[in-house]
């Protein structure tokens, strides 16, 4: 394999194995070249990735030395992607009866999910995250996107237990918007003691559901790494949680004029 061919293949390999430690000896054998050649390739890839804002390439010395690619986006690109999605949310045909917002097409488009996943993963890439948690059903594609970039598993909390998940742990929680007591469940095999859990969801009003998932994290003797939501909806009153990050925020839904006031979420407050 010629060097230019190897560089293309190597670059693709790194991108498809984010946050994984790759052994230099194994890479040398795979490409049938000396470790010094692999190191030279990495210098070139590292420079291009950092200049283009693709991610960070780190090398680790020693006989068992390796390389790790950590994808990230610049704050400017994160802001740009959020504004692109905000424009979609401002479309007047998104307003549903009762003041709800139609999100299925946005959360069903892979390119949008990739953007949402990148923004959330960028916010938490320097923190220890072992597992991503969400609740069925619309939070699942977001959780999968974030988990893929962080290279960690994701677990799904359900409101109704599934027989295929075996023994479960259940908690009751108070819905923040309707003040009803509801139930959520998670398989006992999903989490291990001491894991750092990042909670993600598609939409938040009173934060009752997220508060319930937070209770589940503590019931499993795990640690909360953070809470991130795609869209923060308008809510009159006090939310059940105040420590969270949101990509976008809906300040007001004007049903009469069929307009939605969409602003950037607090994830951009310090950027």
UniProtKB/Swiss-Prot annotation:
SUPFAM superfamilies: PRTase-like, Winged helix' DNA-binding domain. The keyword Flavoprotein does not apply. Induction: Autoregulated. One of its GO terms (biological process) is negative regulation of purine nucleobase metabolic process. Disruption phenotype: Disruption of the gene leads to a purine auxotrophic phenotype. Pfam families: Pribosyltran, PuR_N. The keyword Transcription applies. GO terms for molecular function: DNA binding. Residues 72-271 are annotated as: Effector binding domain. Residues 1-71 are annotated as: DNA binding domain. It comes from the Bacteria. Keywords: Activator, DNA-binding, Transcription, Transcription regulation. Binds to DNA with both high and low 5-phosphoribosyl 1-pyrophosphate (PRPP) concentrations, but activation is detected only with high PRPP concentrations. Belongs to the purine/pyrimidine phosphoribosyltransferase family. PurR subfamily. PANTHER family: HYPOXANTHINE/GUANINE PHOSPHORIBOSYLTRANSFERASE, PUR OPERON REPRESSOR. Homodimer. Contains an N-terminal DNA-binding winged helix-turn-helix domain and a C-terminal regulatory domain (or effector binding domain) resembling phosphoribosyltransferase (PRT) domain. However, the PRT domain lacks enzymatic activity and serves a purely regulatory role by binding effector molecules. DNA-binding transcriptional activator that controls the expression of a number of genes involved in the synthesis, metabolism and transport of purines. The PurR regulon also includes genes involved in nucleotide metabolism, C1 compound metabolism, phosphonate transport, pyrophosphatase activity, (p)ppGpp metabolism and translation-related functions. Acts by binding directly to specific DNA sequences, named PurBoxes, in the upstream control regions of affected genes. Required for growth in the absence of exogenous purines. This is Purine biosynthesis transcriptional activator PurR. It comes from Lactococcus lactis subsp. cremoris (strain MG1363).
């Amino acid at each position: 394999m010629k060097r230019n061919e190897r560089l293309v293949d190597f670059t693709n390999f790194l991108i498809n194995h984010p946050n994984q430690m790759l052994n230099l000896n194994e890479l040398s054998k795979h490409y049938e070249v000396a470790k010094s050649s692999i190191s030279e390739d990495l210098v070139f890839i590292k420079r291009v990735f950092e200049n283009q804002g693709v991610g960070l390439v780190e090398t680790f010395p020693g006989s068992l030395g390796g390389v790790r690619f950590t994808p990230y986006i610049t704050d400017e690109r994160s802001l740009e992607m959020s504004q692109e999605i905000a424009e979609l949310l401002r479309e007047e045909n998104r307003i549903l009866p009762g003041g709800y917002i139609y999100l299925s097409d946005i959360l069903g488009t892979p390119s949008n999910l990739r953007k949402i996943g990148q923004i959330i993963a960028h916010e938490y890439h320097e923190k220890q995250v072992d597992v991503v948690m969400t609740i069925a059903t619309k939070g699942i594609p977001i959780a999968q996107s974030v988990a893929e970039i962080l290279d960690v598993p994701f677990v799904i909390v359900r409101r109704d237990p599934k027989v295929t998940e075996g023994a479960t742990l259940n908690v009751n929680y108070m819905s923040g918007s309707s003040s009803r007591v509801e139930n959520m469940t998670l398989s006992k095999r999903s989490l291990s003691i001491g894991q750092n859990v990042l909670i993600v969801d598609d939409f938040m009003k009173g934060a009752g559901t997220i508060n319930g998932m937070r209770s589940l994290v503590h019931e499993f003797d795990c640690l909360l790494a953070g809470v991130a939501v795609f869209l923060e909806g308008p809510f009159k009153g006090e939310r059940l949680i105040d420590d969270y990050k949101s990509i976008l925020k809906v300040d007001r839904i004007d049903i009469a004029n069929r307009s939605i006031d969409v602003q950037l979420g607090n994830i951009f407050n310090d950027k």
